[in-house]
């Protein structure tokens, strides 16, 4: 959308509706700063295309009367995908599906029919390529008679390649707070403008880290979730994934040194702040 007037129609009440609310607010601010028009709580009712280039999109808004329209030379519909598992031969195969038509499997990809395996977008969970890759490895090793570990959905990062990028992995503050097996749950927020490389880029963003300890080990807090808005967030999230997946104690994670001046320093300073030792921020 660079250099174009862009309108974003969203069905929910905010962008990134299933993500951390603070991250969603930060991304919304940055998108608007780039000139995007964001309209929430919308329902597209019709798209009119004519002989000329472009289309007129008709939509309604929750709580408002009447029909709204917006014209665009290019219209992109990004509303998700449904599995194609309703064919007659599939129904007669005996393979179990859930209420959404997704194939039900165990942790290793086995379906309800012996010898048939399933992975990727046709199974429940996030429809992400890197998740499917890992599922493929698990299925192949299981078929080969090895002893693979099941895919841990809690450590699968999600990325939105917007400008700036958005990335998250693990739990949000609300999700962690609702868990009975976690204690001392807290959220640490780091404004990316405190990072030297961010100042050079002229961009904006934030990092939110959710930390807490298990009931079984209440004196050892770990990182439970990370939510990043900013340049190369898609790369920064990989370090957070390692911390979460390997349950690195927060105090140890905060001791890791990041090169200067890099965007990765922002994550390092967020860890320091979460550990009670803030450096360039309160």
Question: Each predicted region: which residue ranges?
Answer:
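A short alpha-helix-loop-beta-strand transition element characteristic
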Residues: 96-97, 146-155, 181-188
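Glycine/Thr-rich phosphate-binding loops of Rossmann-like dinucleotide-binding domains
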Residues: 16, 84-87, 99, 126, ...
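Rossmann-like dinucleotide-binding cores of NAD(P)H-dependent redox enzymes
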Residues: 1-51, 56-59, 66, 125-133, ...
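FAD-site-proximal beta/loop scaffold in flavoenzymes
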Residues: 69-143
């Amino acid at each position: 959308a660079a250099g174009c007037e862009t309108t974003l129609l969203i069905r929910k009440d905010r962008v990134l509706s299933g993500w951390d609310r603070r991250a969603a607010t930060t991304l919304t601010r940055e998108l608007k700063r780039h000139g995007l028009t964001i309209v929430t709580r919308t329902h597209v009712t019709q798209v009119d295309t004519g002989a000329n280039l472009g289309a007129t999109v008709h939509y309604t808004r929750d709580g408002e009367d009447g029909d709204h329209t917006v014209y665009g030379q290019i219209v992109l519909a990004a509303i998700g995908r449904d599995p194609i598992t309703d064919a007659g031969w599939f129904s007669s195969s005996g393979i179990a599906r859930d209420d959404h038509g997704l194939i039900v499997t165990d942790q290793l990809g086995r379906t309800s029919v012996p010898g048939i395996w399933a992975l990727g977008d046709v199974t429940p969970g996030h429809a992400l390529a890197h998740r499917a890759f890992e599922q493929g490895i698990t299925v192949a090793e299981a078929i080969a008679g090895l002893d693979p570990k099941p895919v841990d959905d809690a450590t699968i990062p999600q990325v939105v390649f917007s400008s700036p990028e958005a990335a998250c992995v693990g739990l949000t503050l609300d999700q962690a707070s609702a868990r009975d097996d976690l204690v001392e749950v807290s959220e640490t927020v780091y404004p990316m403008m405190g990072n030297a490389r961010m100042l050079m880029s002229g961009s904006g963003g934030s990092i939110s880290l959710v930390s807490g300890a298990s009931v079984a080990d209440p004196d050892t807090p770990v990182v439970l979730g990370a939510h990043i808005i900013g340049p190369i967030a898609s790369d920064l999230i990989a370090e957070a994934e390692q911390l979460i997946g390997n349950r690195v104690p927060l105090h140890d994670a905060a001791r890791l040194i990041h090169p200067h001046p890099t965007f990765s320093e922002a994550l390092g300073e967020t860890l320091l702040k979460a550990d009670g030792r803030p450096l360039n921020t309160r």
